[in-house]
UniProtKB/Swiss-Prot annotation:
Catalyzes the reversible isomerization of glucose-6-phosphate to fructose-6-phosphate. Keywords: Cytoplasm, Gluconeogenesis, Glycolysis, Isomerase. It holds the Pfam family PGI. Transmembrane segments: none annotated. This is Glucose-6-phosphate isomerase. It is an enzyme of class 5 (isomerase). Its EC number is 5.3.1.9. It comes from Burkholderia pseudomallei (strain 1106a). GO terms for biological process: gluconeogenesis; glucose 6-phosphate metabolic process; glycolytic process. The gene is pgi. The lineage of its organism: Bacteria, Pseudomonadati, Pseudomonadota, Betaproteobacteria, Burkholderiales.
């Protein structure tokens, strides 16, 4: 199946040509925006969240055509296959059952395994939080260091930061991912070897960055007085390869299992989220799962016309494949969601940054947009200038939490006002005539610089309060959005072959950096020159 061969495609193309020059300002004009208002028609709810799509460049006819696209592309069949545990990751011959990790039904796949592992996690988390689990000298654990990269880092880090307000104040959680030693070194400056627990997270337990950091941390413990025989008090492992965990030196009792039917970027709901559970406790971790389950149920049962992940995915396709948008911005107006954009970068681009269709043919249409972002209001003072007045179209997801999770409540109206005002300004813009009035007769040359084209599309997601449950729903919303887009593009969102070639060549280059001699013909001239400069700096 090719996207542009679907029966609805010519109708979508014709519709795009029809409305491409229409301005949102006109659609919101009082004469045109009668009851039910545009905001009422294009605001939908699900899983405890609300999404206002009204400031997007679409009409009722657009949504109808996009929903038809979803049906013709088999979105419903792909969704149902994923939930049923079918092989939806054909290149690796695997299911993608992250939803089973939060299911609460006895007939859901792998429930006995999931329940047993979560119970083990809960016992361990309770022991650490209560002080029953101590370091080798009997000190309570005051620091947890999560060592992992990609999905073993981004998800847990994002959630622990987001739920800081409900986390225990007795334990600080640190995350180390980069093989750059500075990442680990800065954490080592802040922790006590007698009161630190390390969680090493790697699906294979062979990941270069993770194992390099894990070995350095183990050496640091020993160098700072921890007997090698007591390291079991300070190290646990999370992996789908328990034998490698034990081989590293972690006690078998300290191994938590993940499975090959859960992809790394979808794995925070599993034992990969052990650092989350220690931070917020097992009960709140269950609430996080419940929120994701709320969105799972909405995704499975809501009509496509009112289905938040479906609509969010289709709106993204509208801009990517018709308007030619190269990127889209995620702007959470919540400092607690500081790491959400970087988490979504991996979720979206590693999942859907593909050029090969499921059938092995190459696509002849764009797939994943570049995903980027920064919390508001910081972004307003960095890159919003380009969003308002630059020539590039960048669709935006605003995320607003309506009630604060902190005691400084007087700040919150200012935060929300900025979020809503930005969406209004991006939609309305400022005409040249309006700019001339502001510039005045004394400075007419200033008017062009005061114009804003407007018509910049935004979606605003509303969360009543940031809780484990609403956060779980928000994360699952984006997970399912990715699946919707993958189904339409006919690609596999659950593999990541694009990371492999660099890893293979990286091992060759690393060997050349320390080898006695290097064959300059082994690499291209640029790479050879880079290696030569590095060897000189390293004293080789």
């Amino acid at each position: 199946m090719t996207l542009n061969s679907l029966p609805v495609w010519p109708a979508l193309q014709a519709h795009y040509e029809e409305i491409r020059d229409a301005h949102l300002r006109d659609w919101f004009a009082p004469a045109n925006d009668r009851a039910p208002t545009r905001a009422e028609r294009f605001t939908f709810e699900g899983g405890g969240l609300a999404a206002d799509f009204s400031k997007n460049r679409l009409t009722d006819a657009t949504l109808a055509l996009l929903v038809r696209l979803a049906r013709e592309a088999g979105v419903e069949a792909r969704r149902d296959a994923m939930f049923a545990g079918e092989t939806v990751n054909p290149t690796e011959g695997r299911a993608a059952l992250h939803t089973a990790l939060r299911a609460n039904a006895p007939d859901a796949p792998f429930q006995a395994q999931v329940a047993a592992e979560r119970a083990k996690m809960a016992r361990f988390a309770d022991a650490v939080r209560s002080g029953a689990w101590t370091g080798y000298t009997g000190k309570r654990i005051r620091h947890v260091v999560n060592i992992g990269i990609g999905g073993s880092d981004l998800g847990p880090k994002m959630v622990v930061h987001a739920l800081h307000h409900v986390a225990t104040p007795d334990i600080a959680t640190h995350f180390v991912s980069n093989v750059d030693g500075a990442d680990l070194a800065r954490v080592l400056e802040r922790i006590d070897p007698e009161a630190t627990l390390a969680i090493i997270v790697s699906k294979t337990f062979t990941t270069l960055e993770t194992m390099t950091n894990a070995r350095s941390l183990r050496d640091w413990f020993v160098a700072n007085g921890c007997p090698e025989g007591a390291l079991a008090k300070h190290f646990v492992g999370v992996s789908a390869n328990p034998a490698e965990v034990v081989k590293f030196g972690i006690a078998e009792a300290n191994v938590f299992e993940m499975w090959d039917w859960v992809g790394g970027r979808y794995s925070l709901w599993s034992a990969v989220g052990l650092s989350i559970m220690i931070a917020i406790g097992p009960e709140r971790f269950d609430e996080l799962l419940a929120g994701a389950r709320d969105m799972d149920e909405h995704f499975r049962t809501a009509p496509l016309e009112r289905n938040l992940p479906v609509l969010q995915g289709l709106v993204g396709i509208w801009y990517r494949n018709f308007f030619g948008a190269q990127s889209y911005l995620v702007a959470p107006y919540s400092e607690a969601l500081h790491y959400l954009p970087s988490y979504l970068q991996q979720l979206e681009m590693e999942s859907n940054g593909k050029s090969a269709r499921i059938d092995g043919a190459f696509v002849d249409y764009p797939t994943s947009a570049v995903t980027w972002g920064e919390p508001g209001t910081n972004g307003q003072h960095a890159f919003f200038q380009m969003l308002h007045q630059g020539p590039t179209l960048v669709p935006i997801d605003f995320i607003a939490v309506l009630t604060p999770e902190h005691p400084l409540a007087s700040h919150h109206p200012k935060l929300l006002a900025n979020c809503f005002a930005q969406s209004e300004a991006l939609m309305l813009g400022r005409t040249l005539d309006e700019a001339r009035k502001i510039a005045g007769p004394a400075k007419p040359e200033l008017a062009p610089h005061l114009t804003f084209p407007g018509n910049r599309p935004t979606t605003t997601l509303l969360v009543d309060a940031l809780t484990p449950r609403t956060l779980g729903a928000l994360i699952a919303l984006y997970e399912h959005k990715v699946l919707v887009q993958a189904a339409v593009w006919n690609i596999n969102p659950f593999d990541q072959w694009g990371v492999e070639l660099g890893k293979i060549l990286g091992k060759v280059v690393e060997a050349d950096l320390t080898a006695a001699q290097v064959d300059p013909a082994k690499h291209d001239s640029s790479t050879s020159a880079l290696i030569a400069r590095a060897r000189k700096a390293l004293g080789e």
